[in-house]
């Protein structure tokens, strides 16, 4: 199968699987399938590091579906580490962002972490969960910065959407209930993962 056809097929099936998760069905396990599909697509193209990051995300989704928060955090932390490794291996950009832009983005990420530290983490009663969330948040934001440094729109937007989704999860779980939280969490999550996949395809 040609690269373009493979790309169209992988994205199309992902969109269908993700859309099924929002349908009013009795089986709500569709959420574990989209990332497994993307992982298999990357594996079929011998993109092993990308496939590993997506597979760890799939395992995180499985743990989330089973409401196992600590294993969920652990698998997504492994996914972020693998994404960071992936970005270090992908084709580097022809030019880097100017230093003021890089510093501004770092300040934005630091502000997000500071907000989580002051607003979300103190409301977590389990010290193990709080510690895991603190470490995971650092890895997530490091992944976001690594994606940003590639000057690739898909990678940057995908990583930012990943951050948005996880921030909403934290607020919804520990601060206050967010109306339509499932949509608010899963739409940016699915879009973010898809854009990370698409962006990585362009740099392999």
What are these regions (language model features)?
Residues 1-204:
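Polytopic alpha-helical membrane-helix bundles and their juxtamembrane interface segments
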